[in-house]
Amino acid sequence: MKAVSYLIVVLGSSAAMALLFVWGGFFNISAREPHWSATTWLMGMVRDRSIAVHSNYIELVQVDGSKSLAVGLEHFHDMCRLCHGAPGYPQSEFAKGLYPNPPELASKSVQTRTDVEIYWIIDNGLKMTGMPAFGATHDKNAILGMMAVLRKLPSLSADEYHSMLDAAGLDKKTQNNSHGATNGDESHSPLIDQKGHHP
C-alpha cells in the first residue's frame, strides 16, 4: 500500500512540475535558441521512425528520368533551392534563420534516404521544421520531378545546373510563385502506385 501511495505522489509531483514548466514559459521557443541535445536526439528518432513507417505504404513506379527532371526543375528552382540552395545558388537569406536549418540536399544525410522516404517527405512535409507539404499543392508527377532533381544534385556542377535552366528556358533569378503548381485528380497518374492507404 505504501508503494502505491509513493508511486501516486511521484506521478502527481512529476505532472505538476511538467505543468509548471509548460505554463511558466520556461521552454524557449525561439528559433535562435538551439534544442537541448537530448531533445534533438529524441526528435530525430521520432522523425526518422515516422518517415520510415509511413513511407512504407508507397510503391514508386520506374519512370523516365529525363522526363521527371524536365517536370521537376522549374518547381525545384522556384521553391526548393530557396531554402536548401542549389549548385551555384546559396541558401536564401531568410532560410539561414530557420531552425532546424534546411539540409543541403546533395549531402549524404539526405541522399542515403530511400526514394519512398524522399517522396513521402516532399509530399507530406515535416512538422516544426518549415518543410511544407507539397502534396497539398502539387500533383505526383511534380513531386517525382522534384525528387529526380534532388537525386541528380550530387553530380551537378554550378555550370551544369545553369545549363539545365537555360535548356528549360528558366530564368536563373528568383521567379514568382506562378510556376504551374497542379492540384487536380491524381488517382490516375501513371508514375506512382500506392500500397494500401496513403496516410
PLM feature spans:
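Periplasmic c-type cytochrome electron-transfer domains
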Residues: K2-A70, E93-F94, F134-V149, A167-H198
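Short, mixed-charge, low-aromatic patches
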Residues: V10, F27-E33, L73-C80, P100-S107
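Short, functional N-terminal and low-complexity linear motifs
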Residues: A38-G44, H84-P90, Q111-V116
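Sequence context surrounding c-type heme c attachment/ligation sites in exported
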Residues: A70-H77, R81, Q91, T112-E117, ...
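Extracytoplasmic electron-transfer domains, predominantly the class I c-type cytochrome c fold
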Residues: G97-S155, P199
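Long amphipathic alpha-helical scaffold regions
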Residues: V149-S163, L170
